From Swiss-Prot:
NCBIfam families: asp_carb_tr, PRK00856.1
Record's keyword terms, sorted: Pyrimidine biosynthesis, Transferase
GO biological process, alphabetically ordered: 'de novo' pyrimidine nucleobase biosynthetic process; 'de novo' UMP biosynthetic process; amino acid metabolic process
Pathway involvement of the protein, from the record: Pyrimidine metabolism; UMP biosynthesis via de novo pathway; (S)-dihydroorotate from bicarbonate: step 2/3
Gene3D superfamilies cross-referenced by the UniProt entry: Aspartate/ornithine carbamoyltransferase
Species of provenance: Ehrlichia ruminantium (strain Gardel)
UniProt family annotation: Belongs to the aspartate/ornithine carbamoyltransferase superfamily. ATCase family.
The protein's Enzyme Commission number: 2.1.3.2
UniProt name for this protein: Aspartate carbamoyltransferase catalytic subunit
Upper taxonomic lineage: Bacteria, Pseudomonadati, Pseudomonadota, Alphaproteobacteria, Rickettsiales
Gene: pyrB
Broadest EC class assigned to this enzyme: transferase
């Protein structure tokens, strides 16, 4: 395997290797090695990112790789160069791996057909997939709970526009999780692997082992999908009161960025969630993914 474009690119062996390696890195987060010494990794992000871009940079550099991050706002795209030509020109410089984020669903899969000999990671494409975030969430849940099978996992928020939801549902359902999606009717779509659909928030999180919250992706909303953020928060924000309906050992997750006071209260985000642990796990998981693609294939 030389590309990670969708979560279904990974078989059980791949995922087990990534999990085991990630946990080693997580438990030894202050230890650097040179497993990627001499490798050049290009970050090509056509869409805004804080956590994902920083996480990949830190992961690559801590493994000894050289990283090149392209500032798209000052690239030749401003002179009329197409996205495809930009990627092809970067590839012609023979990097060992290109990490791409795009606002266009399926774009990275399409461009990969022109780059058969290049290692590529999909760092998020439109509302299609975000496979590395799903692996981070899988590893985080398994690290804390010890398993995925038979866990009640509620994914709440803007399901319709969420690449994180799609990748997580595909991965977690494969390992036997009972997945509920919780959202207003206008932010729901039919996805294979979902056990239950709820429009009532309390019903959707009742008896949950894991609550995964998603922000409203207003930048992708083209139609009238919610009346207001205030009404959405009133009906769908996780707070200390409705959190009591979940299991006592529930873990609260969020892939970021969070909009506190909309999908999650300040108190729950800061006192009851494992959001920062997810971020720490993100570096460990991305180290494992980079090593798997560049050292074990």
């Amino acid at each position: 395997m030389n590309m990670l474009l969708e979560i279904n690119d990974l078989n059980s062996y791949d995922i087990e290797f990534i999990f085991d390696t990630a946990i080693q890195h997580f438990n030894n987060s202050n230890v650097s090695n040179n497993s990627l010494y001499g490798k050049t990794i290009v970050n090509l992000f056509f869409e805004s990112s804080t956590r994902t871009l920083s996480s990949f940079e830190i992961s690559a550099k801590s493994l000894g790789a050289r990283t090149v991050t392209i500032n798209v706002s000052t690239s030749s795209m401003n002179k009329g160069e197409s996205i495809i030509d930009t990627v092809l020109n970067i590839n012609a410089m023979n990097p060992d791996l290109i990490i791409i984020r795009s606002q266009y669903s399926q774009f990275i899969k399409e461009i990969s057909k022109y780059l058969p000999n290049c290692h590529i990671i999909n760092a998020g494409d439109g509302h299609h997939e975000h496979p590395t975030q799903a692996l981070i969430d899988y590893c985080t849940i398994r690290y804390i709970k010890g398993k995925i099978h038979n866990l009640n996992i509620s994914i709440c928020g803007d399901i319709l526009h969420s690449r994180v939801a799609r990748s997580n549902i595909r991965l977690l359902s494969r390992y036997g999780a009972n997945i509920s999606i919780v959202a207003p009717p206008t932010l729901i779509c039919n996805l294979k692997g979902v056990s239950h659909i709820h429009h009532n928030f309390v019903e959707g999180i009742s008896d949950s082992d894991v609550i995964m919250l998603l922000r409203l992706q207003k930048e992708r909303m083209t139609n009238f999908t919610i009346s207001s953020e205030e009404e959405y928060a009133y009906l769908y924000m996780l707070n200390s009161e409705n959190l009591s309906y979940a299991r006592s050992d529930v873990i609260v997750m969020h892939p970021g960025p969070t909009n506190k006071g909309v999908e999650i209260s300040h108190y729950v985000a800061e006192k009851k969630s494992i959001i920062l642990l997810q971020v720490k796990m993100g570096v460990a998981v991305r180290k494992a993914i980079l090593e798997y693609l560049l050292c074990h294939n």
